[in-house]
Amino acid sequence: VRFIMTDLRSGATAATAKESASKSKMGTAQKAWFKQELINARDSGFPLIVWVCPDPWIAPAQLGDDSWGGHVTERTELANFIRDNRITNLALISGDMHGLAFDDGTHSDYATGGGAPVTVLHGAARTSDGSTKGGPYSGGVFPGNMQYGVLEIYDNGGPSVACRFVGMKVGEGRKLTHIFSGSPAGSKDHAIVNIST
């Protein structure tokens, strides 16, 4: 499994800036690096690529929003890149929403004309008040504090991995579960298969 972490603050254009091809959450250098990392992970045959994305990917377009909804041109650019380069085994661990949620790809496809659904996982908040940010999410949303997410990856050395995401609330236990598998990108149209929710 290949984990890729990005910084969406230090090189970002203000969310209040007018939408354009130059408006960016990543900045030019990091975006080029990120795209190359996706290609490298695909070409290396990793069964799963996990993007640790500090901000919610799923969100309606809204100028000034701090999620990817405030940078829709760049989000579409990245989604088109993911689709065009057959990065079919990408899952996102997203931050900056104070709640538990997951999406199985139903609401996460921002490529022009479709073709780039990704699994999105949210596991928070430890101490902050609960809130819902972005969405909708196919697995629902559980806002609140004293929560966390666990992504378990089972690898038997074969060409695929099995994954289970569990959203937990301290004192109450499991609030949501999403089980999926990942196979090397390019091996099929959708290398992430949803097993159960």
Regions found by a protein language model. Give the residues of each.
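Metal-dependent phosphoester/phosphodiester hydrolase catalytic core
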Residues: V1-T197
